Amino acid sequence: MVHLETRRRLAGLLFAVGLVPACVGGRGALVSPGVPAHGPDERADLVVARDGSGDFRTIQEALDALPPDAPGTRIILLRNGTYREKIFITKSRVALVGEDRDRTRIISSELRSEWRRTHPDDWGAAVVNVGDGVEDLVLANLTIHNDYGSRGGSHDHQFAVRSGKGTTRISVLHANVIADGGDTISLWNNASGMYYHASSSFEGYVDFFCPRGWSYVTDSRFFGHGTSASIWHDGSTDEDQKLVIQSSRFDGVPGFALGRITRDGQFYLLDCTFSAAMADRPIYLAREPETFRWGLRAYFWSCHRDGAEFPWFADNLQQANGAPRAEQIDARWTFAGQWDPEATLPAVLPFASIPVPRNGARAVPAEGSSLRWIGARKAGAYDVRFGRTDPPPIVARVEGTAYEPGPLVPGTTYFWRVDAVTPAGSVKGFVWRFVTGGPEGGTGSNASKANG
C-alpha cells in the first residue's frame, strides 16, 4: 500500500540522520516515544497534529516529506486545529484530509494586490497554492480561509485556493472554502483543467467561484458577500469547456448577482435553488471580452428562486450545443468522458460519500439501477440501509461499494444510507434520496442520470 511505503521511506530517512525521535525543524517535531501517531486502523500515510501527537506539527513539512511521486494517492490526515500557515503543493496524487470539516482549519491572510507588489506572479498569493502541473489533488473534510478582509479591511481579490498551468483532476469534497474577498477558489488551467466539487460550501466576494476549463459542482452551497457576481467561468480555449452546477443552493447579501463573464464562458445550472436575496439580473458580460468566439452561454433546468421566479432562468437546455437532456448531465458528461471522478476517486473521507444516483436524483430507472458510492478511508465493509421511509431500514452488509436493490416501484421516492464499518466501530453516513421514473415520477424536468 502507498501509505506503508511512505512511512518506510520517512522512517528510514529519520533514522539515517539521527532524528528518532528528535525534532525536524522545530515546530515540525515528530511524536514523542510512546505516543502513537497512527491508530491501528488508520490508513493515512502521514498525520499532522499541532499538539505534537502526529508525524508533523505543520502541513508544509508533511507535504515536503512525501516522495516526489507515487502510483497512488498519498493521504495526509490533519488533526483538528487551526493551522495558520500558507501551503505549497508541488506533488501530484496527494489528498489533504481534515479530521473534521469545521474544526480543521487552514487560515492565512494575503491580498493579491499586495503580494504582486513584490512578486512577479501569484505563486504564494493563496492559502493553498497548487503548483503548475499538479494532478489528482484532493482537498477534503476541512476549512480553508483567506481572512485578509476581516483583518486588513479590503475585500479585493484574495485567494483561498489557486492553481495554474497544467493542473487537473482537482477535487474538493465536503469542505468549506472561504475568502473575505474575491476569487476565493481559482483553479486556473484554462487549457486542460478538470475540477470536481461535491458537498462543499464556497463564500466570498466578486467572482468567488471562478474556474477556467471544465468544472463540475454538486450538492453544494454558495454565499456571495458582494453584489457584483458569485460565479465566473473562462471557457475561452475550447468550445466544450463548461461550468456545471447541479443540486446546489445560492444565497448572499440582498441584491447579489448570480454570475458574469469577461471572456467566453459556458454555464449549466440544474436543480439549483436561489434565495430571495438574488437580484433579477441574468448572467452578464462585465466588459468587452478579451476573447469572444462563442458568446455568453447560460443554460438552466428546473431552477427555482424563493418567492418570485425570474424568466431568465427558465428551462432552456434545448438551446445548448447538442441539446443535452437533463438525465445525461453529470460529472462524466461534463468532462467529455476523460474523467469520471464519481467512479474513481480514492477513499479519503471517514464516511461513505458521492452517491450514485446522486442525492435528489429524479427519473432513476426502476429496472436495472444499482446504488454505488465512494468508500470510507477505514472501512472494511458497509451497512446499507434502503427503503421508502426516512430513516431507511438496514437491508445488507456488503464488502464493496455497490448494492443491487432489485426492481423498484416507478414514481416512488427512495431513501438510502451507507454506514462505514471500521475496526473502531460504525461511521454513520448521510441519508440520500432519489425518485424513480414512471407514472408519478415522470421523466421531465429535474431528470437525473442514475448510473454516472
Where are the regions that the model predicts?
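Short beta-strand segments within Ig-like beta-sandwich modules, predominantly Fibronectin type-III
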Residues: 394-399
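Conserved aromatic anchor
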Residues: 368-378
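Surface-exposed, short loops/turns at beta-strand junctions within beta-sandwich domains
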Residues: 406-413
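N-terminal secretory signal peptides and thylakoid transit peptides that target proteins
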Residues: 2-17
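Extracellular low-complexity, O-glycosylation-prone stalks/linkers
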Residues: 379-392
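Extracellular fibronectin type III
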Residues: 410, 423-439
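Sequence-level preference for short, compositionally simple segments enriched
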Residues: 30-350
